[in-house]
């Protein structure tokens, strides 16, 4: 009994002192990226630039951007609790949004290993920059499971 209480207390304590963002490629609901801050995964970087442009880079090549550069300076990116990803200027006025706001909940913006940036809670928005076939079965469905929910089997030609 004492050991169980000690384990519960340790878990609570660790939860309190552990940073909320344990991964370099995830932005959680309520978190922000200030100027110069970024998400990264391998050679991919999703950065809030000084000129207020939010840009996805593959090494040093820009792949996607909000095209908000020059509209202000020192902006920040917010992953809102309603699922909307928004770039705000220093006066807290939105200058770009993913337009994915809906119900309040727990959402994450993830820079994935396929280079795509996706908002999850329910898939609400993506940059569309993925490099591979993600979410598509590697082999045909088995007879036991002839369909995989809403996933359609796609074969390469």
Curated annotation (Swiss-Prot):
Disulfide linkage: 52-75
A GO biological process held by the record: response to virus
GO MF entries: D-mannose binding
Locations listed in the record: Secreted
GO CC, any one term: extracellular region
Keyword Secreted in annotation: yes
Biotechnology: Can be used as a chimeric variant with insecticidal venom toxins to obtain biological insecticide candidates. This lectin has receptors on insect midgut and this allows its internalization into insects hemolymph. In an other hand, scorpion and spiders toxins are naturally not toxic when administered orally to insect larvae, but a fusion with this lectin makes them toxic for the larvae that would eat them.
Secreted found in the keyword field: yes
Ligand binding (alpha-D-mannopyranose): 49, 51, 53, 57, 60-61, 64-65, 67, 80, 82, 84, 88, 95-96, 99, 106, 112, 114, 116, 120, 125
Signal peptide region: 1-19
Quaternary assembly: Homotetramer.
The protein's role, per its UniProt record: Mannose-specific lectin which binds alpha-D-linked mannose. Displays a high affinity for alpha-(1-3)-mannose oligomers. Displays antiviral activity and therefore may contribute to defense against infections.
Protein name: Mannose-specific lectin
UniProt source species: Galanthus nivalis (Common snowdrop)
């Amino acid at each position: 009994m004492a050991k169980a209480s000690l384990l519960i207390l340790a878990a609570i304590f660790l939860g309190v002192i552990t940073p909320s963002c344990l991964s370099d490629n995830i932005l959680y609901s309520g978190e922000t990226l200030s100027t110069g801050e970024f998400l990264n995964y391998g050679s991919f970087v999703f950065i809030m630039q000084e000129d207020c442009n939010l840009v996805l880079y593959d090494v040093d090549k820009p792949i996607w951007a909000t095209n908000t550069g020059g509209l202000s300076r020192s902006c920040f990116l917010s992953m809102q609790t309603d699922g909307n990803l928004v770039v705000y200027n220093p006066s807290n006025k939105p200058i770009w949004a993913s337009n994915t706001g809906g119900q309040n909940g727990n959402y994450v913006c993830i820079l994935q290993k396929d280079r795509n940036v996706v908002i999850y809670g329910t898939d609400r928005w993506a940059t569309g920059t993925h490099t591979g076939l993600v979410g598509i079965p590697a082999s045909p469905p088995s007879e036991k499971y002839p369909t995989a929910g809403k996933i359609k089997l796609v074969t390469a030609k």
